[in-house]
Each structure stands twice: as C-alpha cells, then as structure tokens.
Swiss-Prot record:
Its main location: cytoplasm. This is Proline--tRNA ligase. GO terms for biological process: prolyl-tRNA aminoacylation. The gene is proS. Belongs to the class-II aminoacyl-tRNA synthetase family. ProS type 3 subfamily.
Amino acid sequence: MPKEVITQRSVDYNQWYLDIVREADLAEVAEVVRGCIVVKAHGWAIWELMQRALDDRIKATGHANVQFPLLIPKSFIMKEAEHVEGFAPEVAEVTRAGGEELAEPYIIRPTSETIIGYFYSKWIRSYRDLPLLYNQWANVMRWEMRTRPFLRTAEFWWQEGHTAHATEAEAEEETLRILHDVYADFVEKEMAVPVIRGLKTEKEKFPGALRSYCIEAMMQDGRALQAGTSHNLGQNFARAFDITFTDQNNTIQYAWTTSWGVSTRLIGALIMTHSDDEGLVLPPRLAPIQVVVVPIYKNDEERSLVMAAVEQMTAAWKGRLRFKVDDRDNYSPGYKFNEWELKGVPVRIEVGPKDVAKETVALARRDIPGKAGKSFVPQAGLTERIEALLNEMQTALFQRALAFREAHTADVTSYDELKEQIERGFARAYWAGDTADEKRIQEETRATIRCIPLEQPGSVGRCVYTGRETDRQVIFARAY
C-alpha cells in the first residue's frame, strides 16, 4: 500500500482529510445520492464505540432511549417561528406516497424537537410526570449545499436528547449537566480531544432556543469544530405544542424543555485532531482494533512455529484487548504494516522465528511513526505492557492536542490583530459588540464567535471591535 495515496497536510489539508477518509476505509461518497456517504465497516465500528461510551453516560444521568418517527408533519415545523426560519433552507419534503399527493407534506427529520414536543404534550399532565428524560439514536437529513464526509453531509447519524422540566432552573441544570458530564467528558476522555466549553451568542444559538451551550475543538489547520451542543429551549416549544402540567398548587404551567446532540461529525474531529501524513491515528479507547499482530515467516515450518507462539501470546488478550492477527498469506509483511498504519491501529506486534527463539516481539506504536516508535520487548508480561502503553498513548494524544491548541491560541486587542490571528488559530478577545457587528466581522474575515467561554478571566478590557469596556471574552475562529 503506497504512501503516495495520502496528500501531505502542508500541501493540501482538505485533500489530506479526504484521502484519509477514503484510504483508511472509513467512508465513501454516495455519488448516486446527493450529499450522502456510505459509512464503511471501519468507520461504523468507530461510531459504535462512540455510541457505546456516550450511551453509558447518557443512561448514567437518568435518561432512557426511545425512537420517534422519521417523518414529521410540515405543520409541526411551522409552529415555532425561529425554528422554521432556521431550518427552512435545509429541509427535504415528502409530497407523494402510494402514487398520490399527500394531503399534508412530511418533512424528513432534520431534528425532532417538534414531533417530540407533540407527544410530550400528550404524555405530560402533572408535575409528577416530570422530569421527562429521553434520548434517541437516529439518522437525520439536512439539505446541505456544500458537503464533506462526516463533517457536513445531507444525511448523518446522531443522538438527540429531549427533556422536559418543571422549572427553568432544572432545565438549565440539565443543559449544563449534559455539556459537562456527558459531552465534554466523552470528547476529552474517549476521543482525547480538548474542548472549550462555552455559550453561543444570539447570532449562533440554535433556532428557537433560549440559550445554546457548546464544546469547541481546534483542528490541526487551526479551525474550530463544534463537537457538541446543549440547548435550553425555555418555554418556546412548550408554548408552541402546548406542553403543560398542573403544578403542586394546582396551577397549569408550561414546561421547560431542553435538547442536545452529537453526531458522526465527531469522526471527522477525530481524524483532523490526531492523524498525520502517514494516515489515520486513533486514540486507543475508540480504536476498533487496538493491537494488530503480524506473524512473519518464510515457509510452513516457520509458520507453524510462529503461529503457535502467537496463539499462546494472544490467549491472554481475550476480553482485555481488541486485537486482530493478520495471517493473510497473499500480502507481504510490509504491505500489512502500511495498511494497519494507514487505518490507525494503535499498536502493531511483529513476531518472526528469531523473536520466538528469543521470547521477544517487535512493538510499534502508531502515535510515534518510524523507528522512534518501535522497540523490542519480552513476551513475558506483554499483556500488561500493552495495556499500560495504550493508556499512555491515550494521555499523550490528549496532551499533544492540548499543547497544539494552546500554541495556536492568542489574545488580541485590536481588529487588525484579530484578522492576523485567525489565519493561525483561535483569537481570544474582549467583546461588547452586537449581532450586526458579528455579521460584519464574519463577512470581512469568514470568522465567527465560536463561543463565550464559561471560564472567564474576571478582568475588564476593551472590545476588540467597538472599543467599549467589557468583562466578557469570546473565541473567534474560522470553523467547519
């Protein structure tokens, strides 16, 4: 498998990304269906590991999984003014079925606040029915004009949580719990991607939300990627769909609702945070194959010797490590090394007749390519050594990504400095502007306010655009 298939990041970052998606066998563009992709086995296996880790966290916070219809009556979408305005350009409609025009068109689910709101209005009657904490794993469709595998596609896969509460304080607590205890915790611990937790501006918040919170990550080209969002919807959807309950004083009240979601774009974040010019790099916790063993032999006698040693060695791994023994005879060891390196397998073990005689193996770690990442280690205690190494690699990938973000984030005090810094990464600045100011900056620089970080310096400075005094800092960046 020749290395020339991967464009170097320094030559064309976008093509490098597309090459990895293709050559690491993660996905393929579905050219017969506009804007869609086929997620291949290796890519879906990564998503399944993500799902498992997220689902455990979602259930640990008291939520249950449900499934709502894919098709939503168009009238539902029209009920919430901000919501319909925000999603109108992206919706796909079904107008015919069974050979006839439908009396009312259906919208193919872009998100489910409206149809879930309808059913919540039927299910909630009393304060005793609250909180209602549900999540669903689903595919959605948004008619995106410019698509890129995983990062922005017409159809994608996600989880969307939808909850209803008796008070605004409870809804706000839920919104922040999901942001911190589920999303940020998952992305940092499982994906090894550092994130900034923040509040979206009025311009950037979810259509129809009271407040939108987010986690933002930096990719290797300095751009931001929104890795997850958690929305306090206030009573907007409750009023639109008449989600009411009788409180403890026998008074009818509107519920307070939330929604939150992450999607398969996290696979794109994983690629662009950790991968290199050799191919995909995966954090061990999300690697479908954590260890690949490549037996090396020249004849049947050596094969029997080496495979017996491999079988004995890997017997202790079952239930502890996700591993694969690549004993294909129609590919050379060099081809196999390149293939598994390209697919991002964290650890490669090579075993030949000499290794069997010495009771050693050659061990190569994916996060350090070439000779620097290769060593010869004893077979005794190998299982524990690999487990420790995988933990070390998980931490090292996070620390490397964090160091990169810090090196490419700078405080700016003038608009000229801001324009210069967004060419390199994140610009942190004091901000007292309004939505019109944000729009002008975006038109002039293609940068947006990614978030208002929840951690603020507690000091006062002058707005980078208006010059007014403020104690609020924001993060500007170009984004995916």
